[in-house]
């Protein structure tokens, strides 16, 4: 949706870190020129610090894991590690930390990745698939009382981020029916003729992608309303819709249908084996994630667009990085590195990866240097975007100015 692209650029303008978040394709192009071992895993494709967070498992447990898989594709494992480490270094600068502190946090991230891969290499495949990092454990293992309270508070906030809590804020009663509230330009209804029929057809196609038992659940709900929703940074400009459903008893269900385009890794790692890009995302997410949304599925629009569907939020909560201390960033980076190792071990050969990485910190230090170098590159790229907007070559819409 070209009319939304200026919002994307506006969000990327905020800082080098938001620029990095919105430029997965640019970094994929850069990473494709770097050496690799030839070992491949199911890669995230957009692995950065804010693509980790909390969410609910089907058993309603709160876990910490990767939570965004729009770009997932089988690819070299190094690409995820380098993007994650670079995001650590850029986030450090965003928080006014020194380059030494940023490098140390990036090194700690990679060290945690390397050491957890070694642990995974000693497990059976089933044990790797069963492994998860739940918030209760993270709270219990907090290094001090302050960190423990902070993690407990964030977990409490995550428990509130479910459809039942979100529903009153996003809807209003109109003529005896609940409707999504327009909040242009970030949430608005589609006035185009035939849009509702196309959407209903797409929902039926999505239904067919669900396992039989999940269809029984989904069939308890009926569609009431839908609207376009602008989400994230890199996703702005792609089609994303939020849909409101109700059960016969009046219980709400909010689903998000997000357009799935070919992965930014595809030009360099090879195209997906799945014709529907939504299916690519769903399969990759199920392969990498600890546990996935019970209503995760895919669909195709009549105009050739591909989508994947899931519950809106469902206890999804990203850890705020603003104001992070050097010690706090280091701890968080290590947790993310551990999560990435587990995700890679599910699809890759942990023993081979661990054997390559070895027991010394040589790889950790090398990626730490890379992270700082790429942080410099990100600053230059962000400055180029700022200059292009000021010169009028690129149109950006800063939402704070609306």
Region annotations inferred by a language model:
Residues 172-221:
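Ordered core of a single globular domain
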Residues 165:
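Gly/Ser/Thr-rich loops at beta-strand to alpha-helix junctions
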Residues 1-44, 49-162, 202-402:
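Conserved ATP-binding subdomain of kinase catalytic cores across diverse folds
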